[in-house]
Curated annotation (Swiss-Prot):
InterPro entries: RNA_pol_sigma_r3/r4-like, UPF0122, UPF0122_fam_protein, WH-like_DNA-bd_sf. Might take part in the signal recognition particle (SRP) pathway. This is inferred from the conservation of its genetic proximity to ftsY/ffh. May be a regulatory protein. Belongs to the UPF0122 family. It comes from the Bacteria. This is UPF0122 protein Lm4b_01818. It comes from Listeria monocytogenes serotype 4b (strain CLIP80459).
């Protein structure tokens, strides 16, 4: 469950602008704020089943966006390469503060 929550949070970060206002709210409450389905249903005055169905559809949408656009996959690949580069530079004593700052800037472009 923890892995799924992390994945959904990351997908939400990348693709939330493609979701409806309602989808954003439900997913945000459920995954980011850790509300239960019942708490969200009470907040929006709808049934628990309606919240569940909407969240499941939204999860499917987020996965489809990732399948087509691959933003999360590319992000994870870049992070892995940055870590490898940092380790290689450290090993060869080439990692000074200026290089560290440049690597950080590259990481934060997205």
């Amino acid at each position: 469950m923890f892995e799924k929550t992390n994945r959904m949070n990351l997908l939400f970060d990348f693709y939330q602008e493609l979701l409806t206002t309602k989808q954003k709210a439900y997913v945000s409450f459920y995954y980011l704020d850790d509300y239960s389905l019942g708490e969200i249903a009470e907040e929006f005055e709808v049934s628990r089943q309606a919240i569940y169905d909407n969240i499941k559809r939204t999860e499917e949408s987020l996965e489809k966006y990732e399948e087509k656009l691959g933003m999360l996959k590319k992000y994870q690949q870049r992070e892995k390469l940055f870590s490898q580069l940092e380790a290689q530079l450290t090993k060869k004593n080439f990692l000074d503060e200026q290089v560290k700052d440049t690597l950080e800037q590259l990481k934060n472009i997205d």
